[in-house]
Amino acid sequence: WRERTNAYVEELTSNIQLAYEKTFGAHSINAVIGFEAIKRDTPKSWLHAIPASNSLHLIYYDTIDKYEDTGNNTEARLGWLGRFNYNYANKYLIDFSARYDGSWKFPPNHRWGFFPSASLGWRISEENFWKESKIASVFSDLKIRGSYGLVGDDNVDGYSAFDYMTGYDYKQGGGVIDGSYIIGTTPRNLPVTTLSWAKAKILDIGLDVAFLNNRLSGSVDFFRRIKTGIPASRDDVLLPEEVGFERPKENLNSNVHTGYDLLARWSDKVNDFHYSISANFTYSRFYNWEQYNPKFSNSWDEYRNSTWHRFGNVNWAYEADGQFQSWEEIASWPIDNDQKGNTTLRPGD
């Protein structure tokens, strides 16, 4: 037998932008507005044949006994964007930006999301009082900056495109009836009608500094990201067992990433040879933040298994007092480790 799978990726992307720049005196402004559209198709087909001869690895139309068009997973996104930047004498920096995005994944009433952000910067080293001070001979550059924004994510876990629709899923197994293979269908889960974008609020505060005519430079950043709208089900909503489906997903949970970045760089040249050496360090911790209606059997269960406002990806484990060195030590050990009188233990355990 022979089989062949043909798969394609067809993506059409449109990106239109209009930019404006203007400088007057010490003032400089920059503005951009744009439109973006993405459509992606992934058609796929599979065919099977029983050739008259196995000597040639070919598939002929006359010998094809099965053909399956496994469908076309269409994706589509549409968005509007805008940005405004203001710069005064390279000292005061202001930037505003925003996106208005729509995703094919979500139901029509929850398909669009608005995601703004803003950043401010102050280059202290460009101030006259700084240039006139003795400390200016040490610092080549000093800048304080901060930003805060909202970012959307439609790649939500536990949710597939068109889960907001009712009906049936095609090509879900099958069976042989009267000598013919019949492709099966299954009813879809309860429609997800309220799920929308997961959103991340991101705060960043940083300091840029340079010394020795910018040969030695570095930066320090503190960041905090709060992601809300993580899909989860309302387990306090009771459904009869006869329903046979899980509870629909909603934007209920959240998590947090917080930490800091450090960067140091040395740049110089020897004659016409330019070189730079840099090092960076990042510390980040992940927290499971809000969870919808967690349930525990008792306070000990909550202490051991709750993830509410706790570090994520932390597992409980045993603390080892050491290894048994002899049979005598095992025989005198007061704790029944294996629940069999320690008869399964050996030196080295």
Regions found by a protein language model. Give the residues of each.
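Extracellular/periplasmic, surface-exposed regions of secreted and cell-surface proteins
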Residues: 1-319
